[in-house]
Regions:
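General marker for long, soluble alpha-helical cores
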Residues: 1-180
Length: 180
């Protein structure tokens, strides 16, 4: 097995030459030892083949360094397995790269870990993919951060799951966005 030092010394071409079998064999220790530049060298094929334990081994800094195409390549179960800290490390552009399948797999803990700016970076399509359970778990702060287009993306069944607390937390502007 490659040491962390040896793995880290591979250039992008060498990392790109790793087979699926080799990628799947990387240990948590090896992945934890990589810096952001090293992680950026993994292809979307490599990323899509990472097991949940491998994804969990990536640091928040490494997660924040993933490209949008790498983010989109993570399996939905892989995204769901991320800690709230790792998930909250995603930038707005990375959150925008999540597929609707990935979004619908998110846990309420992950969604609640996002600040209002990051939560508001979800597209209308992504918000429409949220489950009713996810919608009922959105904080009032994050719900208030959405604009009219984003509110319009919610399906009737999603809106019906809003709690009294969530509705009471909406401003008059937010309420008007629900009715436009």
């Amino acid at each position: 097995a490659l040491s962390v030092t040896n793995l880290s010394a591979l250039d992008a071409t060498q990392v790109g030459a790793l087979t699926t079998t080799q990628t799947k064999a990387l240990t948590a220790t090896q992945l934890t030892g990589l810096d952001a530049a090293d992680v950026a060298e993994f292809s979307t094929t490599h990323i899509s083949n990472f097991a949940n334990t491998q994804l969990l081994a990536l640091t928040s800094t490494n997660m924040a360094a993933l490209s949008e195409t790498q983010i989109a390549a993570i399996s939905a179960p892989g995204v769901k397995a991320l800690t709230a800290t790792n998930f909250a490390a995603f930038a707005e552009t990375q959150l925008g790269a999540l597929t609707t399948t990935q979004v619908s797999s998110l846990t309420n803990t992950q969604l609640q870990a996002l600040n209002s700016t990051k939560f508001a970076s979800f597209t209308a399509t992504q918000l429409g993919a949220l489950t009713t359970s996810q919608v009922s778990g959105i904080s009032t702060t994050n719900l208030s951060a959405l604009d009219a287009t984003q509110f319009d993306a919610f399906r009737t069944t999603q809106l019906q799951t809003l709690t009294t607390t969530q509705l009471n937390g909406l401003s008059t502007t937010d309420i008007s966005e629900l009715t436009t």
